[in-house]
Amino acid sequence: MQSILSQSPGSRFSQYMALTKPRVTQLAVFCAVIGMFLATPGMVPWRVLIGGTVGIWLLAGAAFAINCLVEQKIDAMMRRTAWRPSARGEITTPQILLFSAVLGSIGAWTLYTFTNPLTMWLTIATFVGYAVIYTLLLKPMTPQNIVIGGASGAMPPALGWAAVTGAVPGDAWILVLIIFVWTPPHFWVLALYRRKDYENAGLPMLPVTHGEQYTRLHILLYTVILFAVTLMPFISGMSGAVYLTSAVLLGAVFLAYAWKIYRDYSDALARKAFRYSIVYLSLLFAALLVDHYARPLLGV
């Protein structure tokens, strides 16, 4: 306790920031912001852009903090997560709960004030889906945790779209579907090269419950499905040739990784595939944004 109290403000700030899983939060918020821009042919009002971004970030951070709290014993048993302040006991349970409550409350107020009630309630529902349904119920109980629980993690584009329009039309759900289908292969390649970690922690990830070969096959199958799903923005008319070209090229690389993992697996290859999957989603959504504003100029 004395060591906790004696830490510098900068160190404490870093520890609390770590609870929000900044890199994961950044990707989620990025997809939400893209959803905002795709929802309007012009520019997103600054009030909505700033308020929506801050509110979604705060509620996402609150959800990740609860995740760290619930999984602190599990995290302590895994090399990948043993460094987290919650796993090391550097932040107490009451402190994490208070931190999450403050972030969540400010985030909800920000969304209600600067966007609309629908965005606030959808984001709160996403918080519950991740922090409660996925973390408490699905992750420790079923190898399909990522498939089912991926619904909450796929919501950011819909949240961004709702922030601008007050509605969630079909095009927004296409973006949600892309992230939903992307989630299993993204996490399963991680679970493959971290399978010992998950096994030691007692988590029923797919490589632990069904074996490596089964997981490799499903990574390939889901990546094929993902390739098809990413064509939907073009087919629906939401996006044009710039996006289509990007989706095909990015998807071809992802498919190549999935095929190599299926045929000739190595932990090093899985690590590369995991890193690429993050780059893939970021570039795919960036392509949606570029296409959205380039399409009227290029006429394609």
Curated annotation (Swiss-Prot):
GO terms for cellular component: plasma membrane. It is found in: Cell inner membrane. One of its GO terms (molecular function) is protoheme IX farnesyltransferase activity. PROSITE patterns: UBIA. InterPro entries: Protohaem_IX_farnesylTrfase, UbiA_prenyltransferase, UbiA_prenylTrfase_CS, UbiA_sf. Pathway: Porphyrin-containing compound metabolism; heme O biosynthesis; heme O from protoheme: step 1/1. Gene3D superfamilies: UbiA prenyltransferase. It is a multi-pass membrane protein. Its EC number is 2.5.1.141. Keywords: Cell inner membrane, Cell membrane, Heme biosynthesis, Membrane, Transferase, Transmembrane, Transmembrane helix. Carbon 2 of the heme B porphyrin ring is defined according to the Fischer nomenclature. Converts heme B (protoheme IX) to heme O by substitution of the vinyl group on carbon 2 of heme B porphyrin ring with a hydroxyethyl farnesyl side group. This is Protoheme IX farnesyltransferase. It comes from Burkholderia vietnamiensis (strain G4 / LMG 22486) (Burkholderia cepacia (strain R1808)). The lineage of its organism: Bacteria, Pseudomonadati, Pseudomonadota, Betaproteobacteria, Burkholderiales. The gene is ctaB.
